[in-house]
Amino acid sequence: GKVEDRIDSKFVIPKSALVGDATDLFDFIAQSVKKMMTENAPEDMEKRVPLGFTFSFPVDQKAVNKGLLIKWTKGFSTKNVEGNDVVELLQASLRRVRVNVNIVALCNDTVGTLVARYFVDTDVQVGVIIGTGSNACYFERASAVTKDPAVSARGNAVTPINMECGNFDSKYKYALPITVYDEEMDAITPNHEHQRQEKLVSGMYLGEIARRIIVHLAQLGCLPRELVDGLCKPWMFESKHMGM
């Protein structure tokens, strides 16, 4: 179908939800959904509204509306989520805040970009995300997916494969060109020695890598020291400043 109208709302996840308990994070998301609906579609508050849940983390997806978080990435360390069904956690929070929303589908963000584009261009083969994190997916022949007999039984049909390629080089180190700045930055992340490829190219980390390079150049005398007086603390320089 065609989307006739689209309304966007943005919400900043509080630090307490990034490091707190599952209820802190998913209750915040549920409250944000409720706020958006109240402001933009109050007439739908009494209806049973279907919701698609894009979740850009490694998931063991058991069904279209069921997926277990394998491991947090991108600075998240919220407790009691890894190994649990993220759809069930969000659905419980939606019930707690009393918003009549039913999660009908769970989707990785790369798969979402690929499938959405496929509606208008059937030649598309790859979906890529380079934002806070980094990942890619592609269409594969179902018969080649031997890991899941139910999928491989579909023969020549195609199915999207979420690569989770941001984790490339985490097991076999140094296939990628890692610098001392990358190593120093990786050492202070919650998922040390994981998501190595993602940490080289994505917005969550580029600002910190740039900050370390700038500080080092100032220490060598290549830049005036007063230029870096406000950059001595990790994560003080965000990636968005690099585009100014």
Which residues does each PLM region occupy?
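ATP-binding/phosphotransfer module of carbohydrate and carboxylate kinases, centering on a glycine-rich
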Residues: 1-52, 95, 119-120, 178-244
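Glycine-rich phosphate-binding loop and adjoining helix at the ATP-binding site
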Residues: 5-30, 34, 59-118, 123-126, ...
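Short loop/turn motifs enriched for small/polar and acidic residues
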Residues: 54-58
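Short beta-strand-to-turn element immediately C-terminal to the catalytic PLP-Schiff-base lysine
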Residues: 137-141
